[in-house]
Amino acid sequence: MFEVFRDLFNPQEDGVTQAAINGTDVLDVAREQVLERGVGLDQAQTLQVLQLPDERLDDLLSLAHEVRMRWCGPDVEVEGIISLKTGGCPEDCHFCSQSGLFASPVRSAWLDVPSLVEAAKQTAKTGATEFCIVAAVRGPDERLLAQVAAGIEAIRNEVDIQIACSLGMLTEEQVQRLADMGVHRYNHNLETARSFFPNVVTTHTWEERWDTLNMVREAGMEVCCGGILGMGETLEQRAEFAANLAELNPHEVPLNFLNPRPGTPFGDLEVLPASEALKAVAAFRLALPRTMLRFAGGREITLGDLGAKKGILGGINAVIVGNYLTTLGRPAEADLQLLDDLQMPIKALNATL
């Protein structure tokens, strides 16, 4: 008899969350646990948030904004990024047009030091406090590290801005060299939940990325780690990813949304619905109440202008301005005007040192 009733009533299929079954509302729980006490939602609670119906979205975003203001404050950190080495990467990240294994239109190219300095100057003019040097590699070789060192020295001589790097997986010796160069923050994304990672990358493991991040923290650099939503992961795996990040406890989490690139294995995937993307933004804020949560790639195609505004009023407290590595972003002026319209102050450089 129990089997019959179980088959007739599946709470998840009927859109009923465990919180509703237990007679508690997950947003009420989050208000007391996260907003009042600063304790992030666990994996099961985050899943309940992701399963909320669309009619609860505004309430969810409002609560996430309150949490962000309570535990992070009103300031928004602005960052620009530049690709030092583009394309020709030996890894097979299925979302990435920079892989040399796929028939994408992106070709390998290097940027010289004067171009790096000019990009840093233009980034600083927007009010950004962070400039991130990125390279499409499995990990840096000696040539790349020498170019990074020369670029950092030249930038420091001419631009008052903090420098971050994203150069793939590192050895312990490479981590220390970057720290000695004065790299403020290191980005290395886990990309997705541990259980879903083999569907995204097969040429290296999730654990290899995790090891790099731990070495970065031990060397005294800030850890920046996020990923891409909308690569075919389930809501359960999205909640798992938030829990993975909460365990890592990075200083910053960049949230990207898949922008399907021609020639890649994920090139034909559908763009994530805006409501799902916004629920994820709010859910990650409730799971990571004190973490810098940054709007990154794909938000233009996924959310548009209105969605970007809702995200900044729904838990986001950092943005990448200008273009991304291989795709166009919003004009920096548009993001800066949006922050001004929302009366969100840009974090000052001296407040982040």
UniProtKB/Swiss-Prot annotation:
Recorded metabolic or biological pathway in which this protein acts: Cofactor biosynthesis; biotin biosynthesis; biotin from 7,8-diaminononanoate: step 2/2
CDD domains noted in UniProt: Radical_SAM
A matching Pfam family: BATS
Residues the record lists as binding [2Fe-2S] cluster: 132, 165, 224, 294
Signal peptide region: none
Domain Radical SAM core: 74-299
Coiled coil location: none
Known role: Catalyzes the conversion of dethiobiotin (DTB) to biotin by the insertion of a sulfur atom into dethiobiotin via a radical-based mechanism.
Similarity comment: family membership: Belongs to the radical SAM superfamily. Biotin synthase family.
HAMAP family: BioB (MF_01694)
Descriptive protein name: Biotin synthase
Organism: Mycolicibacterium smegmatis (strain ATCC 700084 / mc(2)155) (Mycobacterium smegmatis)
Lineage: Bacteria, Bacillati, Actinomycetota, Actinomycetes, Mycobacteriales
Gene: bioB
